[in-house]
Amino acid sequence: MIIDAVLNLVGKPYLPGVKPSLAKLPTDIKIVDVGTGSGCIAITLKLEIPEAEVTAVDISDKALEVAKQNRNKFDAKINFLKSDLLERIDFKPDVVVANLPYVDKDWDWIDKEALSKEPEIALYAGDHGLALIKRLIDQITKRAIPFLVLEADPCQHEDILNYARKKGLEKLETRGFVITLSNPQVSH
């Protein structure tokens, strides 16, 4: 789970009794949630790490409107920005989290009927579902951002990790659908 991975980075494990295994960051960090959708990840991170500055970005006006409505329900102090990935972010975050579209339309094993309830822009990506993830990894390395926590299908993890290594990122952890990457060129 993305939330658990970020809490692990700041030494605040989500589950009671679990020792943090990464604990590399203070809690007053800047977090950007790329592809925020409904805002649930950004909202939960802000509620779990109140001292963090959380910015939620999405390319969809409709998604941002839903995320703002959800933020208001929880009174979470979150910034919102319409942006194609990190293009309009004018500061350096400590952590970027992303649950981007990663489904390949050619996958014959997915339940297309179940997915039909979601907007296509929130589900599908080209390049075997990796197009947006690769663009984000490129932006992470170009901007020297210390950490990236992202969700992808486990069948994609090897390709993502190989691409990330070519770009200079290192795997800190994979758990379920979540990959945590570190940029060793940046002091943490």
Predicted regions and their residues:
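Mobile active-site "lid"/loop adjacent to the S-adenosyl-L-methionine
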Residues: L100-L132
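Short alpha-helix adjacent to the SAM-binding motif of class I
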Residues: K62-K73, R135, N162-Y163
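Short beta->alpha hinge that forms the Motif I/post-I loop of the SAM-binding pocket
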Residues: T36, D58-D61, L132, A152
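SAM-dependent Rossmann-like transferase core, predominantly class I methyltransferases
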Residues: M1-P50, S60-V66
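Short SAM/SAH-binding signature in class I
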Residues: P93-N99
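Conserved SAM-binding strand-loop segment of SAM-dependent methyltransferases
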Residues: F74-L85
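Conserved Class I SAM-dependent methyltransferase catalytic core
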Residues: D127-N183
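Short conserved loop adjoining the S-adenosyl-L-methionine
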Residues: L85-K92
